[in-house]
Amino acid sequence: MKPYLDLMRHVLEHGTRKDDRTGTGTLSVFGWQTRYDLAAGFPLVTTKKCHLRSIVHELLWFLQGDTNIRYLKENGVSIWDEWADENGDLGPVYGHQWRSWPKADGGVIDQIAEAVKTLRTNPDSRRIIVSAWNVADLDRMALAPCHAFFQFYVAEGRLSCQLYQRSADIFLGVPFNIASYALLTLMMAQVTGLKPGDFVHTLGDAHLYVNHLEQAREQLSREPRPLPTMTLNPDVTDIFGFRFEDFTLGGYDPHPAIKAPVAV
């Protein structure tokens, strides 16, 4: 996870102090890219323990097109609690846009299903894209999409994914985002008969909140450990058919977790 740690170090040393929506304040840089070879291990941060259960359940929740936190709460995941209304609703956030992008004629587009179809029938297409950034729906979302837009790319039988993330909370959010999209790439590769390639992470406003700086320094003081492996149930051939028990993380030996407040 050297690319992630290099980003954190760079922002600590060269970031610009900025105000932000939450009123917390950040150190920020604009425009950064990291790359992770998914054949070299599963990119889950080892310099602190990450809660894989939350990552997996959130991704499955997105893929089901769900926008109510009930499923997450039932599975012990609280990462969306601060933004939900009294009924647990979040508005037309990620899952809605991924699975039910509204059309002008009143219909919807299932972007994930379309991506799978195109990967199977026209893998050289440069249009295998999923967007969560629906300008017309932003005002109805509890939180505008941070990881806004991703594209799949096939070369020599290997599937790569590039994510554009407009806003990147380096300490708390980015480790989740890396693992989530790496996992999605593994899943998409399996159901389309491809091998995993790279996950490319392109960041817009990459920032450390000022109340995360000491935690970031503590993390940078730790020696990275070998990356774990991620094994998927080979019997699953439908991207919407995965369940939590279909994922097995092996060899994960992280340093202890480091607590930090969430900026809401």
From Swiss-Prot:
Catalytic residues, chain numbering: 146 (nucleophile)
EC annotation from Swiss-Prot or TrEMBL: 2.1.1.45
Top-rank lineage group of the source organism: Bacteria
Any one Gene Ontology BP term: dTMP biosynthetic process
A family per Pfam: Thymidylat_synt
UniProt-annotated binding residues for dUMP: 21, 126-127, 166-169, 177, 207-209
Protein localization: Cytoplasm
Major subcellular location class: cytoplasm
Pathway involvement of the protein, from the record: Pyrimidine metabolism; dTTP biosynthesis
A GO MF label: thymidylate synthase activity
InterPro entries per UniProt: Thymidate_synth/dCMP_Mease (IPR045097), Thymidate_synth/dCMP_Mease_dom (IPR023451), Thymidate_synth/dCMP_Mease_sf (IPR036926), Thymidylate_synthase (IPR000398), Thymidylate_synthase_AS (IPR020940)
GO cellular component, one term: cytosol
Keywords from the named record: Cytoplasm, Methyltransferase, Nucleotide biosynthesis, Transferase
Top enzyme class: transferase
Record-linked SUPFAM superfamilies: Thymidylate synthase/dCMP hydroxymethylase (SSF55831)
Protein family (similarity comment): Belongs to the thymidylate synthase family. Bacterial-type ThyA subfamily.
Physiological role: Catalyzes the reductive methylation of 2'-deoxyuridine-5'-monophosphate (dUMP) to 2'-deoxythymidine-5'-monophosphate (dTMP) while utilizing 5,10-methylenetetrahydrofolate (mTHF) as the methyl donor and reductant in the reaction, yielding dihydrofolate (DHF) as a by-product. This enzymatic reaction provides an intracellular de novo source of dTMP, an essential precursor for DNA biosynthesis.
Subunit organization: Homodimer.
Protein name per its UniProtKB record: Thymidylate synthase
Taxonomic lineage of the native organism: Bacteria, Pseudomonadati, Pseudomonadota, Betaproteobacteria, Nitrosomonadales
The gene coding this protein: thyA
